[in-house]
Amino acid sequence: MCAEKSPAEMKSIFQKYAAKEGDPDQLSKEELKLLIQSEFPSLLKASSTLDNLFKELDKNGDGEVSYEEFEAFFKKLSQ
């Protein structure tokens, strides 16, 4: 996880943005964009594009990011 956020905080952030449209357990590309821009703006600077970041997060290729995919990505970042 990100060093400054606990797992509970990360789950809360995910749920806040996932609930904006459609499935409350999945982030759409637009929801992910809003989450990253608001909560982790430096990630977009480090990543060349949102498309690349979305592809990296969406491990199963279903066009949405589950909490498990989201959590795995942030755990990897904090190592």
UniProtKB/Swiss-Prot annotation:
Q: Which GO terms describe its molecular function?
A: calcium ion binding; transition metal ion binding; vitamin D binding
- InterPro entries reported for this sequence: EF-hand-dom_pair (IPR011992), EF_Hand_1_Ca_BS (IPR018247), EF_hand_dom (IPR002048), S-100_dom (IPR034325), S100/CaBP7/8-like_CS (IPR001751), S100_Ca-bd_sub (IPR013787)
Looking at the record, the residues that make up the EF-hand domain are: 13-48, 45-79
Q: What residues form the membrane-spanning segments?
A: none
**SMART domains recorded for this chain?**
EFh, S_100
Record-listed Phosphoserine modification sites? S42, S47
Q: Does the keyword Lipid metabolism apply?
A: no
Q: Which GO terms describe its cellular component?
A: apical plasma membrane; basolateral plasma membrane
Q: Which residues bind Ca(2+) 2?
A: D58, N60, D62, E64, E69
The record ties this protein, via Pfam families, to: EF-hand_1, S_100
Q: Which residues bind Ca(2+) 1?
A: Q26, E31
* Record keyword Calcium present: yes
In terms of superkingdom, the source organism counts as: Eukaryota
Which keywords are on file for this protein?
Calcium, Metal-binding, Phosphoprotein, Repeat, Vitamin D
Q: What's the protein here called?
A: Protein S100-G
Provide the species name: Mus musculus (Mouse)
Q: What is the lineage of its organism?
A: Eukaryota, Metazoa, Chordata, Craniata, Vertebrata
**Originating gene:** S100g
